[in-house]
């Protein structure tokens, strides 16, 4: 537990493959706090959070990734964003109350949209249908379609303990995008997937990364990189709210203040409410007289 909110990356040096393991506690708790989501929604949001962590760890540049689920089910929209510093935020929007607890019954018929935005360069998107039974399988399909890289993902969430975790195994391409010794590499990949399939939820929520990786891969040559901390970062602030208010006509600001005595703005992500009274908005109101 003490080492949760951490993402570990590692190489299988004899198998031309890579892996990732993310274990989250307070960063997941912060995303669901104050929202009163149903259990099934919390579980899927925890899985999506871990999936986005795993995806951002694949970035080779400074930037961010947003993974959105959109569909015609009771949860019409769910989104998690994260950057190369593993700073995450997420939200779910429900069209109706639901006791559903699977991807298909929560989102319904829909799509997964993955948007990658480098700080320098053009953003690009990948879109796949949510045709698989689980979010993990949909992500593996995304890699198969968009990257042509064999990838397997495992996702776990315990809403009672407010813990979430995920693992990834991915075959490494060679320099020109193909794989050398394909049959051997595919065999190695399947072997690593079989080992990772033995992971149990009680292990991923109780063992620290080093112990868990040893349990899974003690017969493999594994090179573990420096772990990276994962944190919750909503990004809202009073200054950003004031910037939004500045786009409102001064006369309208004055009218709202006259009726309500303040302007209130609530962040969709963290549910923090910012209140601005006449004094704090004096500079905006003064424009109405000019």
From Swiss-Prot:
HAMAP family for this protein: HslO
Short name of one Pfam family: HSP33
Keyword Flavoprotein: no
GO terms for cellular component: cytoplasm
Lineage: Bacteria, Pseudomonadati, Pseudomonadota, Gammaproteobacteria, Alteromonadales
SUPFAM superfamilies associated with the record: Hsp33 domain (SSF64397), HSP33 redox switch-like (SSF118352)
Family: Belongs to the HSP33 family.
PTM summary: Under oxidizing conditions two disulfide bonds are formed involving the reactive cysteines. Under reducing conditions zinc is bound to the reactive cysteines and the protein is inactive.
One BP annotation, GO: protein refolding
Protein name: 33 kDa chaperonin
Superkingdom of source: Bacteria
Purpose of the protein: Redox regulated molecular chaperone. Protects both thermally unfolding and oxidatively damaged proteins from irreversible aggregation. Plays an important role in the bacterial defense system toward oxidative stress.
Compartment annotation: Cytoplasm
Stored InterPro entries: Heat_shock_Hsp33, Heat_shock_Hsp33_C, Heat_shock_Hsp33_N, Hsp33_helix_hairpin_bin_dom_sf
Disulphides: 234-236, 267-270
GO MF: protein folding chaperone; unfolded protein binding
Keywords: Chaperone, Cytoplasm, Disulfide bond, Redox-active center, Zinc
Keyword flag Cytoplasm: yes
